Amino acid sequence: MSTWTGKRVAVLYGGRSSEREVSLRTGAACADALRQKGHEVVLLDVDLEVAARLRAERVEVAFVALHGRFGEDGSIQGLLESMAIPYTGSGVLASAMGMDKTVSKAIFRSLGLAVADYRVFPRASAGSIGVGDLPFGLPCVVKPAGEGSSVGVHLVNEAAELGPACRDAASHAGDVIVERYVKGTEVDVAVLDGKALGAIEIVPANAFYDYAAKYTAGTTKYFYPARLPEAHVRAVMQAAEAAHRGIGCSGVTRVDFIVAGDGTPYILEVNTLPGMTATSLVPKIAAGLGLSFPDLCERILDGAALKA
């Protein structure tokens, strides 16, 4: 029996971020899965009245199914802490650090994890960034520091592409990060309660795994387990666990890597609230271990707690 059997569960989804549509899918899928396990579930689309609605609905525990700003960055976690409502996923500080790529990259380096060379530029100077500002040259990857789901991310191969890419990244959240492009195999690792569940290989139809590749059906192939030498899989899973611990995460995370030809796992980011539809990557990995989607959601719910 679940820790929260008989309790009123709110699945928090939607919200105001650029990843709202993804969150709506995640929340609906998780709510359905928890109902299949017998839980009393109310779906709450997070808005400026969410605190009043949590009280009105007599919520006893929150399943956080938000993505992006205001949901994955510690904001909703802080509200839940102040209301003494236990919640799933990482706490305020871990969520904030995981969302800010500038902070998380510095932490990864301090842990001894492989991080591609990068530079951080203030949003105000994005329009003046040139190839001469990049000691690693081209190709490079441009991304906003405070977004997820590859929103505002660009692969830049030519000098003429750099300015527009930087200006677009600056239109999103956070500073602009420009990092050396690492050629290799894209691999994501699911971590649950500090233990790596497995590694899945991602093969997009084009050279770059961008927003369209993630969310347009049929544009990307996935291979689980990842088609890598066993030693490389072990290395990437160990790195994922180290990143999860280093950020101070709780519950489930998805840690993204590029595994170079020599087996070096270059870490990209930790997703403290990964996509959780029945066809998302974390559920795919869990299914490979015999853990159904409803069982996975209940495992995550069982870890709900106050973290402050």
From Swiss-Prot:
Residues annotated for Mg(2+) 1 binding in this entry: D256, E269
Positions that bind ATP: 133-188
Gene3D superfamilies according to UniProt: 3.40.50.20, ATP-grasp fold, A domain, ATP-grasp fold, B domain
Pfam family, any one: Dala_Dala_lig_N
EC number: 6.3.2.4
SUPFAM superfamilies in UniProt: Glutathione synthetase ATP-binding domain-like (SSF56059), PreATP-grasp domain (SSF52440)
Compartments, record wording: Cytoplasm
Pathway: Cell wall biogenesis; peptidoglycan biosynthesis
GO biological process, one term: regulation of cell shape
Listed GO CC annotations: cytoplasm
Main location: cytoplasm
The keyword Ribosomal protein is assigned to this record: no
PROSITE patterns (alphabetical): ATP_GRASP, DALA_DALA_LIGASE_1, DALA_DALA_LIGASE_2
Free-text cofactor note: Binds 2 magnesium or manganese ions per subunit.
Record's catalysed reaction(s): 2 D-alanine + ATP = D-alanyl-D-alanine + ADP + phosphate + H(+)
Binding site for Mg(2+) 2: E269, N271
Protein task: Cell wall formation.
Family: Belongs to the D-alanine--D-alanine ligase family.
Designated name of the protein: D-alanine--D-alanine ligase
Gene responsible for this protein: ddl
